[in-house]
């Protein structure tokens, strides 16, 4: 099939549509603080989009690049389309925010500016200002002797026009930087939050004594946060990375967010110094710095405004009284998080770190939390003399500093730490434990679609797979050898690895289903689909009658076309859990189920080390089948791609199906049923049976 730009949706505009679906959650009949969370998530997503994607397009435009995407939109065309889209959507964001705040007030939860407080609360704010804010804020004069200051990425400040009390004709421009150590809101009482800029503005004349405040405007800046590291020229990669992180703080300004109605002189002054294109200036009639709304959304006093808290469950064959290695010896085990608990993953490493029979632990780390029990267990194992090898991906965007910290801690404990492979990111999620069993060695593996991160495991849907099969032992050993040594043969036998194998394998399996015509079936769940070769292969399969169901949460570049895609159904699921699992089903392949760390994107398939894992175990395959079937039945959280490239909520007059809530209920039901069953084999069989029946 000839490549045609009309086959593809634009990557950046597709991402914007995804983020619009996130914002659309604010229109759902959710508890109010849950709706507020989606405002915060939407704005956080948009920050990163501007820092990386928009910044990248600006660089391409400056370099004179005319074509940069499969749909052949130039960088300038994309920038214009992005700005038009976001300026229009800003009105919708303001509408939802005002609606939610108004509804919160009916529930007696308020965000109030200083002037709207009663005298008692004003006195508390006054005391808070002088005890907590005044000592750490940074007042800045800007004039001939005071240059324009450095503003950190996503920094939040107050710009002021002030005049000399004795010479009012002398007008000065100043800024007050608000440090991130200060909370975005001051919780002046159990139900009242005061925006910090409102407090600072009220006390401007104490901050600039002898001057009178004329006008003020809160503003927030976004910088280019992409980081290019010349790995080939680096003798000390860790040092080069640390230097890169310092340079990132000085990235070019790419966006200015400012209060609507700000004095024209203030806006002009900021623009003059930051040189931001006027279409990248966004004026808001609502509060700025909305990612910080998590502070209010986490209010424990108003639990009735939150969704009921779900506690992930550990199901058989895992048992707190049974060694995790004994459980894996009996059978392969697949768990679906966060409905099932992440605890077995932690226990896998924790138990290995204390087991005298364990001689080696190998693991990849991409994103870990700041206080990681898993990394602490690895440190303990290394300190105890176990051979610990850890691949810490120092290039994991926005986690570089945290990963640097853990890499140093692991090295200090005696672990062998690998920083990555030149020119690639290591995105695979895999760990391997080697134990002595008599005079032989036994290998245990964990392969996953998600990170070794207990925090994200509570809010991301992912699939984990535990096995002790010999073929997985061989391939994971080879994979870690590739990471730690030199290897030109980057191919595995049972697992598939990128950059050499995964795309090749996927194209082979698509071609096989296409050869079966209307008997062919493909179901693929992932975060994003961008790769043009795979898109063309899916078109060809659809033309031949293959039924293709794609569950893609985020970016989706296959353009609907009656001629090419009539047998392709595309849906995106947005709910309280972020859909992060990659699960693939190809009816006529053997095996026919796979999980993977890789999305179908060029970066994953060509510029990262990823793994795709075949699932042979019948119970695990049945579990994945039910998982995919449930997602395809969802008519509450699901959106379907329309012929015009837009998404619409799934229309249905049938019983409401919320795939995430149903999984919570099913797992809870199984857990409750099995809680008192002490017969491990019966409990395991019943768990599998209940899951399949439900």
From Swiss-Prot:
CDD domains assigned: PLDc_PaPPK1_C1_like (cd09165), PLDc_PaPPK1_C2_like (cd09168)
Gene3D superfamilies to which the protein is assigned, alphabetical: Endonuclease Chain A, Polyphosphate kinase middle domain, Polyphosphate kinase N-terminal domain
This protein's record includes keyword Calcium: no
Protein residues bound to ATP: 45, 460, 553, 580
PANTHER family xrefs: POLYPHOSPHATE KINASE
Gene Ontology MF terms: ATP binding; metal ion binding; polyphosphate kinase activity
Similarity remark: Belongs to the polyphosphate kinase 1 (PPK1) family.
Post-translational modification: An intermediate of this reaction is the autophosphorylated ppk in which a phosphate is covalently linked to a histidine residue through a N-P bond.
The protein's name in its UniProt record: Polyphosphate kinase
Active site annotation, chain numbering: 427
Reactions catalysed: [phosphate](n) + ATP = [phosphate](n+1) + ADP
Cofactor(s) in the UniProt record: Mg(2+)
GO CC entries: polyphosphate kinase complex
Enzyme nomenclature, EC number: 2.7.4.1
GO terms for biological process, alphabetical: polyphosphate biosynthetic process
Biological role stated in the UniProt entry: Catalyzes the reversible transfer of the terminal phosphate of ATP to form a long-chain polyphosphate (polyP).
């Amino acid at each position: 099939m000839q490549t045609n730009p009309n086959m593809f949706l634009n990557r950046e505009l597709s991402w914007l549509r995804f983020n619009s679906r996130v914002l659309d959650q604010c229109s759902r009949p959710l508890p109010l603080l849950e709706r507020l969370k989606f405002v915060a998530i939407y704005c956080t997503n948009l920050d990163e989009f501007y820092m990386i994607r928009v910044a990248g397009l600006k660089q391409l435009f400056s370099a004179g690049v005319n074509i940069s995407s499969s749909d052949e939109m130039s960088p300038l065309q994309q920038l214009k389309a992005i700005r038009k889209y976001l300026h229009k959507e800003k009105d919708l964001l303001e509408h939802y925010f005002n609606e939610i705040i108004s509804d919160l007030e009916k529930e007696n939860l308020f965000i109030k500016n200083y002037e709207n407080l009663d005298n008692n609360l004003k006195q508390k704010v006054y005391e808070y200002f002088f005890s907590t804010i005044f000592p750490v804020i940074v007042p800045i004069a800007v004039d001939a002797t005071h240059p324009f200051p450095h503003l950190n990425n996503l920094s939040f400040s107050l710009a002021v026009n002030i005049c000399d009390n004795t010479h009012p004709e002398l007008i000065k421009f100043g800024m007050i930087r608000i440090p991130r150590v200060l909370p975005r809101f001051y919780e002046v009482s159990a139900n009242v939050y005061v925006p910090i800029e409102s407090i600072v503005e009220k006390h401007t004349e104490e901050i600039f004594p002898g001057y009178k405040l004329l006008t003020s405007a809160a503003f927030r800046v976004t910088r280019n946060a992409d980081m290019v590291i010349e790995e080939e020229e680096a003798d000390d990669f860790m040092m080069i990375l640390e230097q890169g992180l310092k340079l990132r703080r000085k990235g070019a300004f790419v966006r200015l967010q400012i209060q609507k109605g700000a004095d024209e002189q203030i806006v002009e002054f900021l623009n003059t110094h930051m040189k931001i294109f006027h279409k990248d200036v966004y004026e808001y009639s609502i509060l700025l710095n909305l990612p910080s709304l998590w502070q209010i959304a986490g209010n424990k006093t108003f639990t009735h405004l939150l969704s009921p808290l779900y506690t992930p469950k550990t199901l058989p064959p895992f048992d707190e009284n049974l060694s995790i290695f004994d459980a894996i010896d009996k059978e392969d085990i697949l768990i679906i998080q966060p409905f099932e608990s992440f605890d077995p993953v932690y226990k896998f490493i924790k138990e290995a770190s204390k087991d005298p029979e364990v001689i080696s632990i190998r693991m990849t780390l991409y994103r870990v939390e700041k206080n990681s029990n898993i990394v602490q267990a690895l440190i303990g194992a290394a300190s105890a003399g176990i051979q610990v090898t850890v691949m810490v991906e120092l290039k994991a965007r926005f986690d570089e500093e945290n990963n640097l910290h853990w890499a140093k801690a692991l090295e200090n404990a005696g672990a062998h730490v690998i920083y990555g492979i030149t020119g690639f990111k290591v995105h695979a999620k895999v760990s391997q434990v080697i134990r002595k069993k008599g005079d032989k060695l036994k290998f245990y593996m964990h392969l996953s679609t998600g990170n070794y991160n207990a925090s994200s495991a509570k809010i991301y849907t992912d699939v984990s797979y535990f096995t002790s099969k010999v073929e997985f032992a061989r391939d994971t050993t080879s994979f870690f050898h590739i990471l730690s040594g030199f290897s030109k043969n980057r191919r595995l036998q049972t697992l598939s690895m990128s950059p050499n194998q995964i795309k090749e394998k996927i194209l082979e399996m698509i071609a096989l289903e296409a050869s079966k015509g209307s008997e062919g079936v493909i179901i693929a769940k992932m975060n994003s689909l961008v790769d043009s070769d795979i898109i063309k292969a899916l078109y060809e399969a659809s033309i031949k009658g293959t039924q293709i169901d794609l569950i893609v949460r985020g970016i989706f570049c296959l353009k609907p076309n009656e001629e090419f895609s009539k047998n392709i159904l595309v849906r995106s699921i947005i709910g309280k859990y972020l859909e992060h699992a990659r699960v693939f089903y190809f009816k006529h392949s053997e095996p026919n189920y796979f999980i993977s760390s890789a999305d179908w994107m060029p970066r994953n398939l060509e510029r990262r080390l990823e793994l795709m894992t075949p699932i042979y175990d019948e119970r695990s395959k049945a579990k994945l089948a039910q998982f995919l079937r449930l997602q395809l039945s969802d008519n509450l959280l699901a959106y379907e791609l329309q012929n015009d490239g837009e998404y619409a909520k799934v229309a249905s007059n049938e019983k409401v199906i919320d795939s995430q809530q149903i999984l919570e209920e099913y797992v809870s039901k199984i857990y409750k049923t099995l809680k008192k069953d002490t017969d491990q084999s019966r409990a395991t069989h019943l768990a599998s049976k209940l899951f399949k029946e439900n």
